[in-house]
């Protein structure tokens, strides 16, 4: 599996890049409120076709690796030994980010995967580690079709609300040399063109994503850091509290929209 992934990263991306075509015409966007549209709606027709075909969608390689990691190898600790069949994890991706009482911080699904890897004495390194993203992709695919259920029903609710409020502030705060906030693109300019792309509402329903400009999979954490860079602001370190707060707000903002599973993006 790993050698297939390696070969794909060398040769496969350029083939998809040739097929990507332009962004969809604004006039072709569905009617109705633009702020409720998935990012998949804003893909070009050629990329949407690749997204919908498992035989050409590069995400399939990460899903296959995720399945192998879940089951593990004989004699080694595995996810399945603790959690059983992957289908039992149908709800898993719907609950993150959440407040961890033990760690006293907001964590997302990739953080939880890293924590679990330490418990099995097979620690993974880094949020964008291929194994971490493969397991994240598998869990998000398993939760596809379900809505986010991120509001806690326990004693963490009060702290969770404080974190959510901070995320909302970050979403509307101008930053960087361009003096822009998230809301200026993803609320006020949805459907307009920027850098050859049509601006989407920025709902995190299709993560982790395979982004052509990255030539790899990436998490919400990575995408948010890219946005900081895009407006020429100081980029937070991976896993920073503000990134988790923003992710929490974005998923709260997407309440009522189904998780789509790992997706392709330009």
Kindly give the residue locations of the regions a language model identified.
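Surface-exposed interaction/gating patches
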Residues: 67, 140-193
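Short Cys/His-rich "knuckle" micro-motifs
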Residues: 88-92, 192-196
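Short cysteine/histidine-rich metal-coordination sites, predominantly Zn2+-binding motifs
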Residues: 94-103, 198-206
């Amino acid at each position: 599996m790993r050698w297939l992934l390696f070969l794909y990263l060398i040769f496969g991306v350029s083939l998809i890049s040739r097929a990507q075509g332009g962004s969809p015409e604004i006039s072709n966007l569905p009617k109705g409120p633009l702020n409720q549209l998935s990012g998949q709606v804003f893909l070009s027709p050629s990329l949407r076709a690749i997204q919908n075909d498992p035989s050409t969608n590069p995400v399939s390689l990460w899903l296959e690796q995720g399945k192998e990691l879940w089951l593990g190898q004989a004699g080694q600790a595995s996810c399945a030994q603790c959690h059983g069949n992957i289908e039992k994890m149908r709800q898993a991706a719907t609950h993150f980010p959440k407040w961890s009482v033990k760690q006293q911080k907001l964590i997302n699904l990739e953080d939880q995967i890293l924590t679990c890897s330490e418990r099995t004495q097979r620690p993974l390194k880094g949020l964008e580690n291929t194994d971490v993203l493969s397991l994240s992709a598998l869990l998000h695919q398993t939760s596809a079709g379900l809505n986010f259920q991120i509001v806690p029903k326990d004693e963490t609710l009060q702290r969770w609300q404080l974190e959510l409020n901070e995320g909302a502030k970050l979403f509307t705060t101008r930053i960087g040399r361009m003096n822009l906030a998230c809301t200026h693109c993803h609320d006020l300019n949805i459907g307009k063109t920027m850098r050859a792309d049509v601006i989407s509402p920025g709902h995190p329903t299709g993560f982790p994503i395979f982004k052509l400009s990255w030539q790899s999979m990436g998490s919400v954490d990575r995408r948010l850091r890219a946005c900081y860079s895009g407006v020429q602001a100081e980029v937070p370190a991976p896993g920073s509290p503000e990134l988790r707060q923003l992710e929490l707000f974005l998923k709260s903002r997407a309440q009522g929209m189904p998780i789509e599973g790992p997706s392709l993006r330009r």
